[in-house]
């Protein structure tokens, strides 16, 4: 059974007029998706978004806005059992599938905005520090941060490039936890496609042990 809050809209899509109400200072706009150790579930891959969009906050589901390529690319990579439509909320069956596979989802910053570039540099930096503080307890095998620009700001790594990072370059990053940066899957990112994102997810899933090298 999920411990996450149900969609504030009761399983329907938000209207355009409703979205503005979710642009609040609250730092817990959306609940994390995390495997439950009490159920014997192990966190292998922790996917970290930048921050929730307004649609995502409206339905309490990660990457929920239609047109976001996160869920289609995750499925194409073989990381979900079926295509996921989170536009009205995350189906408990899909959440359970992620947890069984050892996949968790969180954000650098919990405040919902219409666009990620509305966040301040200090919000991103504090979000980066907060993630580092959480890692000793969460203990994922691999962390994948979705967004190179936010990563550069959060961790003062202006020359960082997409792909596998050097964790030792991040102050306080726990030993033994791999770190990757993948492209932002938003439809606003013209440099990424569902296919290219799927390739990125396969790479990080192999690092985390979610997929095996001979997986299709």
Task: Locate predicted features.
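Short hydrophobic segments within beta-strands
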Residues: 46-48, 146, 182
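Active-site and ligand/interface coordination hotspots across diverse enzymes
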Residues: 1-76, 161-175, 200-216
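Short acidic (Asp/Glu) patches
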Residues: 24-32, 83-93, 122-131, 161-168
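Short, flexible loop segments at boundaries between secondary-structure elements
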Residues: 75, 79, 166-193
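Internal catalytic-core helix/loop-beta-alpha segment
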Residues: 100-159
